[in-house]
């Protein structure tokens, strides 16, 4: 069954990514999409990891757009798409999708809240940015969520203290 093989490669991609082996992760995601070109879980993770590295942003945007079209109320997919738009400098568009993500997630993660702050800041809404950075800072790490690095925690605290966006 091609969908099972696709899911297997997708899981391999996630494992490689967790181990910091991004080239292998991307190869696994590519294989996953060969077996099932509509695997939206693969597309979302692949697109997000590319955006975090600021690599192949057009490819990331295309994949992420497909996930949002497939599941328009999925806050995770909306956050990924908003973040890719942010990385491409499309701040107003990013804000629109981030607002949809926030509306569709009753309990947003630290990452989503920080992304919201970053997007609002770059879209010119500095007070709203500060509000979301503070929410992110106050948010406890969920069981299934990767804990932020010390560097990430410090950067968030700097954003709050300096009331401005600080890039990764």
Q: Residue locations for each model-derived region?
A:
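Terminal, low-structured helical/coil segments at or just beyond the last alpha-helical repeat
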Residues: 55, 110-115, 122, 126-168
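TPR alpha-solenoid repeat register
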Residues: 8, 42, 77, 111-112, ...
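Residue-level recognition of tetratricopeptide repeat
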Residues: 14, 48-49, 83, 118
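Short coil turns that delineate tetratricopeptide repeat
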Residues: 3, 37, 72, 106-107, ...
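Position-specific recognition of the canonical hydrophobic site in helix A of tetratricopeptide repeat
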Residues: 10, 17, 51-52, 86, ...
